[in-house]
Design a protein with these regions (language model features):
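Sec-dependent signal peptide recognition
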Residues: 2-7
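C-terminal motif of bacterial Sec signal peptides marking the signal peptidase cleavage site
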Residues: 12-15
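N-terminal "domain-start" segment that seeds a small globular fold
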Residues: 20-52, 77
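Short loop/turn microsegments at loop-to-beta-strand junctions
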Residues: 36-37, 59, 158-160
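Short active-site neighborhood of thiol/selenol oxidoreductases, capturing the structured segment around
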Residues: 51-73, 79
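Structural microenvironment flanking redox-active thiols in thiol-disulfide oxidoreductases
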Residues: 74-134
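Thiol/disulfide oxidoreductase modules built on the thioredoxin-like
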Residues: 130-186
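Short, hydrophobic alpha-helical segments
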Residues: 190-191
Length: 191
């Protein structure tokens, strides 16, 4: 009888452990963070946007720029791949790309760049002041680095993605380099 109870207890503990593992984010859990609560920009279709426009959908918010040689296109491609992996559930997620380069990333440039990864993705832009205010609100670092050459400059910037649940609450910081399968996992947990 004792052996039977011991075996049942072990099975119960293992079951609880598996349930816990399945509900943990791969990215950094930032549930309850007191930043990243305001955004007022314009999307690449010309429509004014704020975070509350997307309530009812999970959101993945990335700050970057279209002339970025590596981090930005890689992150956008990884987000697009994650959306494909999610199948129909991806309809419950809105991906937002906020430009950190309002000088070059016009509405027209964003309208070509952002949907090239997934037609549902939205690019957001604003004045340099609006971008600075939004980046500060999300604790995003960015700095223009002058360079010789055709583009004239690059922008050093934070490289993670902020994920919000359907209630508009910030939940996860998805680190640069997280695999599409891991991104999909984290997004599915907050849908």
């Amino acid at each position: 009888m004792r052996m039977c109870l011991l075996v049942m207890l072990c099975v119960l503990v293992m079951g609880c452990q598996q349930a816990t593992e399945q509900t943990q984010f791969v990215g950094t859990d930032i549930t309850g963070a007191d930043f990243g609560n305001t955004l007022k920009l314009t999307d690449h279709t010309g429509k004014p946007r704020q975070l509350s426009d997307f309530k009812g959908k999970a959101m993945a918010l990335f700050f970057g720029y279209t002339h970025c040689p590596d981090v930005c296109p890689t992150t956008m491609a990884d987000l697009a791949h994650a959306m494909k992996l999610m199948g129909k559930r991806s309809d419950e997620v809105q991906v937002l790309f906020v430009t950190l380069d309002p000088e070059r990333d016009t509405q027209q440039v964003l309208a070509q760049f952002v949907p090239s990864f997934d037609s549902r993705f939205l690019g957001l832009y604003g004045t340099p002041e609006q971008i600075a205010e939004t980046a500060k609100n999300f604790k995003v670092f960015y700095a223009k680095q002058e360079q010789a050459g055709k583009s004239g400059y690059t922008i050093d910037h934070s490289a993670g993605v902020y994920a919000f649940d359907k209630n508009g609450k910030i939940r996860v910081y998805i680190k640069f380099g997280q695999k599409p399968e891991e991104i999909a996992h984290d997004l599915e947990l907050i849908i």
